[in-house]
Amino acid sequence: MDVFKKGFSIAKEGVVGAVEKTKQGVTEAAEKTKEGVMYVGTKTKENVVHSVTSVAEKTKEQANAVSEAVVSSVNTVAAKTVEEAENIAVTSGVVRKEDLKPSAPQQEGEAAKEKEEVAEEAQSGGD
């Protein structure tokens, strides 16, 4: 009977030791898993922030390109409208064609200057 008690006692100590080692192993594994999950979460967050920043920058660039195109189109339409209005005024006899010549180069110069200002503003990001 003592042999059985001693044998079971030794076995019990072995099981307790194994449980302690297993508990320690599980705890370490849980710690490492937590670290891994936190690392992935942090990197994912960084990548999301980077992606959002990239998308925002591209959107800003596209908006600048569109606004530049719109301003250019509006300037073209305005110039054509003035040109046609002048043609109508000349054709109807309200003004003489010679009276319109000096203002045309001046308007073109102003349009070119305005185009330059718009391009500079688009390059600076609208600031």
Swiss-Prot record:
Q: Which cysteines are joined by disulfide bonds?
A: none
GO biological process per UniProt: chemical synaptic transmission; synapse organization; synaptic vesicle endocytosis
Any idea which residues bear Phosphoserine here? S67, S72, S124
Coiled coil (residue ranges): none
Q: Cite the residue spans of the region called Disordered.
A: 97-127
Intracellular or extracellular location(s):
Cytoplasm, Perinuclear region; Cytoplasm, Cytoskeleton, Microtubule organizing center, Centrosome; Cytoplasm, Cytoskeleton, Spindle
Source organism of the structure: Macaca fascicularis
The protein's name is: Gamma-synuclein
Q: Where are the sequence repeats?
A: 20-30, 31-41, 42-56, 57-67
CC annotations in GO: axon terminus; centrosome; neuronal cell body; perinuclear region of cytoplasm; spindle
- A Pfam family cross-referenced in the UniProt record is Synuclein
Ranges for the region named 4 X 11 AA tandem repeats of [EGSA]-K-T-K-[EQ]-[GQ]-V-X(4) are 20-67
Say which domain of life the source belongs to: Eukaryota
What family classification does the UniProt entry report for this protein?
A: Belongs to the synuclein family.
